[in-house]
Amino acid sequence: MVVLPFSKMHGAGNDFVVVAEESVASLCLPELARRLCRRRFAIGADGLLVVGRGKNHAVRMRMFNPDGTEDVCGNGLRCVAKWAVVHGLVAGSRFVVETMDGHKRVELLPDGRVKAELGEPHFEPERVPVLAEGSPVMNLPIVTPAGVIHVTSLSTGSTHSVIFTDSLPDDDRFLRDSPFIENHPLFPQRTSVLWTVVESPSRLRMRIWERGAGETLACGTGACAAAVTAQLHGLAGESVEVYSPGGVLYVQWRPGSPVTLTGAAELVFEGCYPLSEVEP
């Protein structure tokens, strides 16, 4: 039986199946993601990371959500950086990873954490994208079955909508309103939904609904989006700790500069998956 070698990794509880590009070259990657990411029925993960050699740099990555859609992922980027070093794609601690959102600088820190530059956030409606006017799109009212919710929408490589609340939503509200906003017609490519509590100017707490994945324990581009949005609203400074159920991520942003994301990237286990279970 032909098997697929894989690594299981996570960044603050945001977990991924990681595979080498050459081992899946003949497979349909969206279908592979749908199969491998199914919890309880397969390996289970928030996404599939496919890692190979880049055209202009040593490492290239692609990320697929559990529903098969391709996306940008900050925690996935940091896991790819760690995986690339462990598997010998690069020798140094600083290098560049090619992504669908451009080239991203990464650095493995002495304490084992990984730092990544995600680029500058985008606020223009056409780049988020969101069908609204003004830049940035702040306090956009969305009428839900339970009432009006105001969101601030932006892109940090992926589309996010931030909701500031005094306390994180309970399951009923979270599971009702999050998918409603994700699939709202205002968002042509859907949106992740970030329920955010500002605990101090340097500390945020989130509950996360990711487009294409549902609830996740952490989200790297989402942590960046929440930190940037809090700064836009005058609620936070340039350096912010973002807590979510999976742990803490550290975000730094100064207007006009790239957003940087720092946190752990951990190898959980490695294994082999029977390829006969996945059709080309």
Tell what function each PLM region has.
Residues 114, 122-124:
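Ligand-binding beta-strand-loop-alpha-helix segment within the catalytic cores
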Residues 138-170:
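Internal active-site segments that recognize and position negatively charged phosphoryl groups
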Residues 125-136, 270-275:
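Extended Gly/Ser/Thr-rich low-complexity repeat segments
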Residues 1-111, 162-280:
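A glycine-rich beta-to-alpha transition motif near the start of alpha/beta enzyme domains, typified by
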